[in-house]
């Protein structure tokens, strides 16, 4: 299987979530199922069905996290330099609005655009890869093409 690039922080966050699910959430839902069973008829027991549904979600998320972490290739951006690549923290200037935005290019599993974590497979990240400070790019968006200038590239 193909390795999934991930920052050290992204790996740690997913690993922490996995530990929480295994040590806190899973035991809690098992207790909730046991308590709900004590209330008798399971066919009309809403507490039981809700707990089983939550258990199903938790077990699915545990499997998903275990798979992601087993395929993770942790990349330390601080050891990189040069043009924009995975792990780079990039400040860009929207040529239309003159607004500056800063993003770190990360893997799919840790992407969170609202917190400045840009999915490496996104159109913007793909357009930025290989570029340097001062370069301009055009990105196709649902609202039409947008132009950006690369203001700075850092590896932190």
Curated annotation (Swiss-Prot):
InterPro entries documented for this protein: GreA/GreB_C_sf (IPR036953), TF_GreA/GreB_CS (IPR018151), Tscrpt_elong_fac_GreA (IPR006359), Tscrpt_elong_fac_GreA/B (IPR028624), Tscrpt_elong_fac_GreA/B_C (IPR001437), Tscrpt_elong_fac_GreA/B_fam (IPR023459), Tscrpt_elong_fac_GreA/B_N (IPR022691), Tscrpt_elong_fac_GreA/B_N_sf (IPR036805)
Pfam families in UniProt: GreA_GreB (PF01272), GreA_GreB_N (PF03449)
GO MF annotation terms: DNA binding; RNA polymerase binding
Top-rank taxon: Bacteria
Keyword line: Coiled coil, DNA-binding, Transcription, Transcription regulation
The keyword Coiled coil is assigned to this record: yes
Gene3D superfamilies: Transcription elongation factor, GreA/GreB, C-terminal domain, Transcription elongation factor, GreA/GreB, N-terminal domain
GO BP annotations, alphabetical order: DNA-templated transcription elongation; regulation of DNA-templated transcription elongation
Coiled coil: 46-73
Reported function: Necessary for efficient RNA polymerase transcription elongation past template-encoded arresting sites. The arresting sites in DNA have the property of trapping a certain fraction of elongating RNA polymerases that pass through, resulting in locked ternary complexes. Cleavage of the nascent transcript by cleavage factors such as GreA or GreB allows the resumption of elongation from the new 3'terminus. GreA releases sequences of 2 to 3 nucleotides.
Similarity section: Belongs to the GreA/GreB family.
Protein name as it appears in the record: Transcription elongation factor GreA
Origin species: Cereibacter sphaeroides (strain ATCC 17025 / ATH 2.4.3)
């Amino acid at each position: 299987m193909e390795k999934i690039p991930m920052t050290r922080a992204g790996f740690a966050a997913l690993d922490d979530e996995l530990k929480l699910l295994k040590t806190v959430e899973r035991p809690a839902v098992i207790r909730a199922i046991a308590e709900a069973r004590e209330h008798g008829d399971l066919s009309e027991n809403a507490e039981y069905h809700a707990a089983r549904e939550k258990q199903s979600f938790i077990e699915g998320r545990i499997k998903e996290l275990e798979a992601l972490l087993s395929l993770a290739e942790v990349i330390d951006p601080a050891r990189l330099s040069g043009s924009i690549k995975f792990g780079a923290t990039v400040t860009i200037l929207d040529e239309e609005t003159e607004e500056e935005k800063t993003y770190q290019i990360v893997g799919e599993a840790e992407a969170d655009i609202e917190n400045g974590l840009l999915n490496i497979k996104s159109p913007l990240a793909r357009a930025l890869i290989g570029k340097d400070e001062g370069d301009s790019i055009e990105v196709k968006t649902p609202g039409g093409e947008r132009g950006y200038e690369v203001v700075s590239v850092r590896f932190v």
